[in-house]
């Protein structure tokens, strides 16, 4: 079935209402410009959608609220995107990752406790 892929720009603010508005605008755009494109949903894969994020992120944070807009499909064991986006670089030892932001501190503690980040796949109904 046809889908519309959602690209999540790095560093974009993930305020829930702004995200809802963006999705509504995308629906209107596709209905107006591509009326014959019978897509079934908006689809994305990202570290932001990983279900395990709830194990270390602050409840109610923008990332978890953003992920809640999606119906989860599955998680994938690919930590590289998380590490790159949160820490900026790959370190050989977990102890060497920076802990300057709340997210960095929380993810580092999660890693040191044996947690494994990943990617999530999800969709938003048309």
Regions found by a protein language model. Give the residues of each.
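Accessory, usually C-terminal, subdomains that scaffold auxiliary metal cofactors
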Residues: 65-124
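GNAT-family acyltransferases
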Residues: 1, 123-126
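Acyl-donor binding region in acyl/amide transferases
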Residues: 2-80
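Arginine residue identity/basic-tract feature
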Residues: 20, 25-27, 32, 58, ...
């Amino acid at each position: 079935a046809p889908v519309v892929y959602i690209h999540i720009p790095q560093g974009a603010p993930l305020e829930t209402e702004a995200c809802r508005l963006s999705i509504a605008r995308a629906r209107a755009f596709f209905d107006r410009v591509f009326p014959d494109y019978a897509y079934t949903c908006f689809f994305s894969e990202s570290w932001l959608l990983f279900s395990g994020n709830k194990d270390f992120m602050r409840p109610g944070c923008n990332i978890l609220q953003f992920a809640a807009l999606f119906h989860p499909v599955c998680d994938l064991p690919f930590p590289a995107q998380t590490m790159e986006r949160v820490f900026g670089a790959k370190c050989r030892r977990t102890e060497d990752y920076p802990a300057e932001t709340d997210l960095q501190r929380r993810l580092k503690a999660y890693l040191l406790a044996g947690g494994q980040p990943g990617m999530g796949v999800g969709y938003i109904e048309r």
